[in-house]
């Protein structure tokens, strides 16, 4: 899947955060309906790089959860 990675980036008090909704089919594994992580940077370029990495890891993790559910 291809997403606009910048749509997962928010700025709070000058620091970038990654915020992404948890898909409905894996929500039972989470306490919240969103994943929110401070990227600990004030650089937009660094934030985009980090957000892409986190987003890919989440996609892979969620894919694994979906595969386990099929068993």
Where are these predicted regions, by residue range?
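A short, charged, amphipathic alpha-helix used as a generic interaction element across diverse proteins
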Residues: 43-56
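Short, Arg/Lys-rich segments that mark the N-terminal edge of DNA/RNA- and chromatin-recognition modules
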Residues: 1-40, 45, 60, 66-71
């Amino acid at each position: 899947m291809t997403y606009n990675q910048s749509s997962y980036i928010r700025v709070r008090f000058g620091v970038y955060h990654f915020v992404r909704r948890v898909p409905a089919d894996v929500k039972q594994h989470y306490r919240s309906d969103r994943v929110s992580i401070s990227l600990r940077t004030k650089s937009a370029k660094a934030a985009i790089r980090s957000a892409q990495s986190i987003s890919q890891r989440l996609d892979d993790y969620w894919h694994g959860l979906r595969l386990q559910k099929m068993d």
